[in-house]
Amino acid sequence: MAKVESFTLDHTKVKAPYVRLITEETGKKGDVISNYDLRLVQPNTNAIPTAGLHTIEHLLAGLLRDRLDGVIDCSPFGCRTGFHLITWGKHSTTEVAKALKGSLEAIANDIEWKDVQGTDKYSCGNYRDHSLFSAKEWSKEILSQGISDQPFERHVI
């Protein structure tokens, strides 16, 4: 079985919340795709409940696209500690951290239920499992800790 980078990362050494570049892949035609680890809570210490994480996922899908060019996808980790962000092109971890911070600030302070996309049975495969309250509370908690653009030492942006 192929080795997966995420499973070789020493999760006891990282200091969340942070943004980490996992890899940049160059395709046959020269296109670059980047994969980032958006770690919101400390691994093996905490995990965001599914309803809040699900709502954060739906909101980041739009909010990150508003703040960062080339967003392909933002998907939650199964461990519920953060997200993979996949983009076209190269972005510094500082750029991504600023986009993430702005998105979480919007969730914490501005977003209302009517702003959350994909919350009915036609547009979401588990539409009953959402919590804007939880998304807002977790966003506030993450922001209170500061988002670092480095995974192993705190360099809060």
Curated annotation (Swiss-Prot):
Pfam families membership: LuxS (PF02664)
One Gene Ontology MF term: S-ribosylhomocysteine lyase activity
Keyword annotations of the record: Autoinducer synthesis, Iron, Lyase, Metal-binding, Quorum sensing
Entries under InterPro entries matching the protein: LuxS_sf, Metalloenz_LuxS/M16, S-ribosylhomocysteinase
One BP term from GO: quorum sensing
Catalysis: reaction(s): S-(5-deoxy-D-ribos-5-yl)-L-homocysteine = (S)-4,5-dihydroxypentane-2,3-dione + L-homocysteine
Record keyword Metal-binding present: yes
Cofactor: Fe cation
Cofactor: how and how many bound: Binds 1 Fe cation per subunit.
SUPFAM superfamilies (alphabetical): LuxS/MPP-like metallohydrolase (SSF63411)
Record has Metal-binding as a keyword: yes
Annotated family: Belongs to the LuxS family.
Subunit structure: Homodimer.
Record-linked HAMAP family: LuxS (MF_00091)
Protein name stated in the entry: S-ribosylhomocysteine lyase
